[in-house]
């Protein structure tokens, strides 16, 4: 091969293109015996022993490590494109400083059309290559002797016929190699030409002498012609296509350049639909970003329409889900005393009860925003430092009375006892005010009433019409490694829409005690760990948007769970259950072998087993009264109330007798007060909440926005942290 003349080394500024970049990087085969090498960054001539080749692609070389680091910002996009496209040979091993091998492009066989054209498209969309670079030194110059070189086979992907089936795979489909829709969707013909001009100007350092290294055989001319066809399908300009053929010495056979495919882009004024014509196939954009409609036009045949799904990487996230950073979900942690002090500083002298009601409104606003944006919310210091201690004592006292039973599963009838324990090993008790053994659990009743007060403000603020709730489920996880595997609370649409969990575990260490609530939100790429610390209340959607699990527990862990029901979904679930029960009853009646006596004997002889969680939730469901259009919380049962001879207690009744912290206790109660007096005060607070809510419902005429009018802004000194 004759050495390239000097005038050929200076290429026309208007002709370099993706074709020259492709042929220079991938198709040049210089002779290593007479090669004169230069540094890619500074252009200084060096011997092969002084140059350091790129360890990843082997296509560039540098005279020093500093020049390689300075040029990495420019080279890394091409280097990564070569690696991801599979263009780097497998025998390329990292070498510190090759002594004999010159830093020339490795020999690559372009038998795979997908790799060939995907490399072209990746180089065309390279943001670094689209920048105009002036007076950029050449990568390396080559002076070689005249010697024949073998031709490199290039295979061009064939056009898809109208009747062929479109294959799809995660690695690449038949549409991906040479018809990249992202290239044509957002650019017009003018912007395409300007992009090509800018792209061609950025490749001035590529020499046209590299094109003279192609052999002059007819096979090479055919390969170049087919290469030009690929570049035309990839969107290269006609000027750049001419560079591929005119720079090669012509022989008896002349390479012909096929006209570039007609690409037409039209959109309606509203911008909802977009039509792209490539050859005889027309791609119609749809509202769904994953679906396209392709119309193939034939001569006398009718138009054939088909739909196909755009290829997405198998390891990528679901494009339909809007993923968010859930670490930005702030925890509400303002205490009641801090809230009252903030109101007093603003000139609002409110009693402790008024401040508590106002604080519940602020909590509701925080929970509504977090649920609508992230699907879960966390509130700390919900009851207060004294109340949560008595909540834990009451749960432990109920556990010692034998009211708890092992937790069951909805599908427990299909599993053995050991399998159930392996999935769920907690002990639960459905709190019932009619149960005389749980009559002294006054703090639990106060907690339920306060959570109901928060839920009361959800009306017309979320996508569910809350019409009831379940009874409170008191759960204890014994500290012997018990757990609850990953699950969904409501996978079958039984009516539960919001799950609330209250923790009362004092001095909880997540590192040593375990018991973490691990939440898997639908819009989060990573799970969220919520430690069950004392006086923490957690809200999250009960459906498949929030799978969760309880990690192994190594210390007694107390939790109180309440599910709030969507009215329409719950009614449908109950109606479906009644239909199923009626079908089972009619089947038993039609069975001649069954009789009432046999059923009675069978029920007496059948071993009794604990009802499942689903059955208990059906039995213990408390629906809101349906006589009013506004949701009204359940009133306390007669058995839940405590006889109160005196009038409403003072504000000092909020503090427990055992409290010694002056910063928390707001009273001068005598320590000698017994537990019945404390129970009486808590019951009076609960009754006071119900009376205030009833008064608010009577005075309110619209939504919660009326209640928020005239409210002071939330405390600016709210201590916030991230989970």
Swiss-Prot record:
Residues 249-275, 294-323, 678-723 are annotated as: Disordered. Keywords: Cell projection, Cytoplasm, Dioxygenase, Iron, Metal-binding, Nucleus, Oxidoreductase, Vitamin C, Zinc, Zinc-finger. Binds 1 Fe(2+) ion per subunit. Its cofactor is Fe(2+); L-ascorbate. Inhibited by Co(2+) and dimethyloxalylglycine. Inhibited by the iron chelator 2, 2'-dipyridyl. In larvae and adults, expressed in pharyngeal and body wall muscles. It comes from Caenorhabditis elegans. 2-oxoglutarate binds at residue 557. The keyword Iron applies. Interacts (via catalytic domain) with lin-10 (via N-terminus); the interaction regulates lin-10 subcellular localization; the interaction is direct. Interacts (via catalytic domain) with swan-1 (via WD 1-3 repeats); the interaction may regulate vhl-1-independent hif-1 transcriptional activity; the interaction is direct. Interacts (via C-terminus) with cysl-1; the interaction is enhanced by hydrogen disulfide and activates hif-1-mediated transcription; the interaction is direct. Induction: Induced by hypoxia. Fe cation binds at residues 487, 489, 548. Residues 687-699 have a biased composition (Basic and acidic residues). Residues 468-566 form the Fe2OG dioxygenase domain. A zinc finger (MYND-type) spans 39-79. The MYND-type domain is not required for oxygen-mediated hif-1 degradation or for inhibiting hif-1 transcriptional activity. Susceptibility to S.aureus infection requires the Ser-rich region but not the MYND-type or Fe2OG dioxygenase domains. Zn(2+) 1 binds at residues 39, 42, 63, 67. InterPro entries: HIF_prolyl_hydroxylases (IPR051559), Oxoglu/Fe-dep_dioxygenase_dom (IPR005123), Pro_4_hyd_alph (IPR006620), Pro_4_hyd_alph_FE2OG_OXY (IPR044862), Znf_MYND (IPR002893). Coiled coil: none annotated. Zn(2+) 2 binds at residues 54, 57, 75, 79. Disulfide bonds: none annotated. This is Hypoxia-inducible factor prolyl hydroxylase. GO terms for biological process: cellular response to hypoxia; regulation of protein localization; response to hypoxia. GO terms for molecular function: ferrous iron binding; hypoxia-inducible factor-proline dioxygenase activity; L-ascorbic acid binding; peptidyl-proline 4-dioxygenase activity; peptidyl-proline dioxygenase activity; zinc ion binding. Disruption phenotype: RNAi-mediated knockdown causes enhanced resistance to polyglutamine or amyloid-beta-mediated paralysis and an increase in adult life span. In addition, causes resistance to B.thuringiensis pore-forming toxin CryA21-mediated toxicity. Cellular oxygen sensor which regulates the stability and the activity of hypoxia-inducible transcription factor, hif-1. In normoxic conditions, hydroxylates hif-1 targeting it for vhl-1-mediated proteasomal degradation. In addition, regulates hif-1 transcriptional activity in a vhl-1-independent manner and independently of its hydroxylase activity. By regulating hif-1 activity, controls several cellular responses. Mediates susceptibility to B.thuringiensis and V.cholerae pore-forming toxins and enteropathogenic E.coli.
